[in-house]
Amino acid sequence: MGRSLIFSGNMSLRISHLPRSSLPLQNPISGRTVNRTFRYRCTRILSNSFKSTTRLQTKAVLSEVSDQTRYPRIGAKTTGTISPAHLLEVVELAAKTGAEVVMEAVNKPRNITYKGLSDLVTDTDKASEAAILEVVKKNFSDHLILGEEGGIIGDSSSDYLWCIDPLDGTTNFAHGYPSFAVSVGVLYRGNPAAASVVEFVGGPMCWNTRTFSATAGGGALCNGQKIHVSKTDAVERALLITGFGYEHDDAWSTNMELFKEFTDVSRGVRRLGAAAVDMCHVALGIAESYWEYRLKPWDMAAGVLIVEEAGGAVTRMDGGKFSVFDRSVLVSNGVLHPKLLERIAPATENLKSKGIDFSLWFKPEDYHTEL
């Protein structure tokens, strides 16, 4: 099963990304690092190509400067009795194990059932979650687990809560559309402590993956290399992402209006259909912001930490301090956060005035938090 999974080489998907990337070149088929002499020649060619440019406009940059200081941090202050390195090791292993199951199934016919009128679930969701659970239980048998398919499992008195989305973007997966992922995040006393998202890229017959990961206070990585949000400081130059839930209620209608509004004033708004992937794209610097109503803990637990550790900002859509147990999220590169809130927060407050509550809608009973 594992032989079918090719964890992505560190090549950017577009050649225009190469001048601003520090990721090592790898052969996308063998995964082996490209010959150093060849890499040196490529570097010289790229360097010479840009010598005449006095100012190179870039989006994603490697920088430790953060624009998130005005917003409360959401990451855990500590990982408790487990070291950050060990916790991240298991989180990544769990996500990659689930991704192996998905990779095995991605080009095969799928047996699709429905949880509602339009919320489909495949056998792959269930098999991926089972594989992830096996990894978590083997390493931390006393931890509490919240899975999208299996619900609550384990000891509710544990300080650790694993939030598992075994296949984020199931509809995309079912159609072979390249925007889906396996997402695993672990909370310590209610706050994100470690995260891993394995994103599927490519398309039918040429699927590949890249792995995003983060620990609280440890930075964000893509395929082991540090990443950072963009520095775009104007909405007019920003690429934005949102999502729509299955309930066509007032929140859905309000977000449709926000979608139209931001389409008029930004570079564009995308609706890709996988929350974890959307947030990782903000962390990578290829989009500036993502927002959505009606999300659940397993949708957000991994992605929000990766964004924050990449230098971004995370709040509720009304601007309040975010919790994984809330029902709305706005993530951004930090620079644009106040400008986005100027438009989004009033719409959210209007929904709240109608009795729609987006805060702390779901938390496992008896699970201790520091929120």
From Swiss-Prot:
Q: Give me the residues that bind Mg(2+) 1, please.
A: E148, D165, L167
Family matches, as PROSITE patterns? IMP_1 (PS00629), IMP_2 (PS00630)
What domain of life does the native source organism fall in? Eukaryota
Q: Which of this chain's residues are annotated to bind Mg(2+) 2?
A: D165, D168, D299
Please state the protein's primary subcellular location: plastid
What reaction does this catalyse? a myo-inositol phosphate + H2O = myo-inositol + phosphate
Q: Where does substrate bind?
A: E148, L167, D168, G169, T170, G273, A274, A275, E292, D299
Which residues does this entry mark as bearing N-acetylvaline?
Answer: V61
Please name the GO terms of the biological process aspect recorded for this protein, alphabetically: inositol biosynthetic process; phosphatidylinositol phosphate biosynthetic process
Q: Name one GO cellular component term.
A: chloroplast
Q: List the Pfam families.
A: Inositol_P (PF00459)
Keywords, comma-separated and alphabetical: Acetylation, Chloroplast, Hydrolase, Magnesium, Metal-binding, Plastid, Transit peptide
EC number(s) for this protein?
Answer: 3.1.3.25
Its annotated compartments are: Plastid, Chloroplast stroma
The organs and tissues expressing this protein are described as: Ubiquitous. Expressed in pistil and seed endosperm.
**Gene3D superfamilies assigned to the protein according to its UniProt record, in alphabetical order:** 3.40.190.80, Fructose-1,6-Bisphosphatase, subunit A, domain 1
Q: What class of enzyme is it?
A: hydrolase
The cofactors it requires, by name, are: Mg(2+)
Q: Which GO molecular function entries does the Swiss-Prot or TrEMBL record give?
A: inositol monophosphate 1-phosphatase activity; metal ion binding
Q: Which family does it belong to?
A: Belongs to the inositol monophosphatase superfamily.
Q: What is the name listed in the Swiss-Prot or TrEMBL entry for this protein?
A: Phosphatase IMPL1, chloroplastic
**Lineage start:** Eukaryota, Viridiplantae, Streptophyta, Embryophyta, Tracheophyta
